[in-house]
Design a protein with these regions (language model features):
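Generic secretory/membrane-interface signal
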Residues: 5, 17, 138, 156-159
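Feature captures outer-membrane beta-barrel proteins of Gram-negative bacteria and organelles
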Residues: 141-147
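Flexible, surface-exposed loop regions and adjacent strand-edge segments
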Residues: 40-51, 56, 131-137, 169-181
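Homeobox/homeodomain signature
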Residues: 12, 20, 79-81, 133, ...
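C-terminal beta-signal and adjacent terminal beta-strands/loops
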Residues: 120-128, 149-200
Length: 200
C-alpha cells in the first residue's frame, strides 16, 4: 500500500521598503504534515536488529515484533520481510524560511553601491523515510552576503555563502553490508569569492 500524507500549513511573504535605500523582507512557511497511512514503512537498522534477535519467526511465533518493527509473513506462514506503521508520524519540518535585506546607495559617475544579506533557516527534520533517530537533522541557520558596485554595463561583486561555515547535510542513508552504519550527503561549507560581469 502506498503511503498517504496529509499536509496543512501557512505561508507568509513580506517586503518592506524601509527607506529609499533599504528594503527588507521575510518568507516563512509553517507546516503540519503527517502520514495518514503508511503501514509498510521500512524498519530502522536498530529495529531490524532487534527483530533479528528474536530468531526464526513464523506466523505462529509468540512474539513477531520488536521496537515497533513487525515481521511480515507469506501465505505458508514463513517470514517475508518486516515493516513498521508510521501512520500519524510527522512529515517534514514545522517551519522554514528566510530573512533578507538589500541596501543600495548611488555613487559618483552613475555608479551604484549595493549590499545584500540573507538568512535561511529551518526546523529539524528526518532525512530518511524510516525516521531513524540517528538520521535526524537539527534545525539550523545559514547566512549569505554580497556587496559590490554596479554600472550601466558592468558589475563587480564580492560574496560569501554560508559565512558562518554551518555544517549541514542534504540527505542520509544506511550503508549496505554494514549493519547499523549510516552515511550523510554533506552540503558546501563556507564559500567566498568575487565576480565580474560585463554586458556587451
Amino acid at each position: 500500500m502506498q503511503p498517504r500524507q496529509m499536509l496543512k500549513g501557512l505561508e507568509i511573504d513580506m517586503t518592506w521598503q524601509a527607506t529609499d535605500n533599504l528594503r527588507v523582507g521575510a518568507s516563512v512557511a509553517f507546516t503540519d504534515g503527517s502520514y495518514g497511512s503508511f503501514p509498510g514503512a521500512g524498519c530502522t537498522a536498530q529495529q531490524a536488529s532487534d527483530l533479528l534477535a528474536l530468531g526464526v519467526l513464523t506466523v505462529d511465533s509468540p512474539v513477531t515484533s520488536a521496537g515497533g518493527c513487525s515481521a511480515k509473513f507469506k501465505g505458508d506462514g514463513t517470514q517475508a520481510g518486516a515493516g513498521q506503521d508510521l501512520a500519524g508520524a510527522q512529515v517534514g519540518t514545522d517551519y522554514n524560511g528566510s530573512l533578507w535585506a538589500d541596501y543600495t546607495r548611488p555613487l559618483a559617475s552613475g555608479l551604484l553601491w549595493f549590499t545584500s544579506v540573507d538568512m535561511n533557516f529551518t526546523d529539524g527534520y528526518f532525512m530518511t523515510g524510516d525516521r531513524d533517530p540517528i538520521d535526524y537533522h537539527n534545525g539550523f541557520e545559514k547566512f549569505n552576503i554580497r556587496t559590490g558596485v554596479r554600472a550601466e554595463n558592468w558589475t563587480v561583486m564580492l560574496y560569501g555563502k554560508n559565512i558562518t561555515d554551518e555544517e549541514t547535510a542534504t540527505g542520509a542513508y544506511d550503508i549496505p553490508l554494514a549493519a547499523g552504519s549510516h552515511g550523510r550527503y554533506t552540503s558546501e561549507g563556507s564559500v567566498w569569492g568575487a565576480r565580474l560581469t560585463y554586458s556587451f
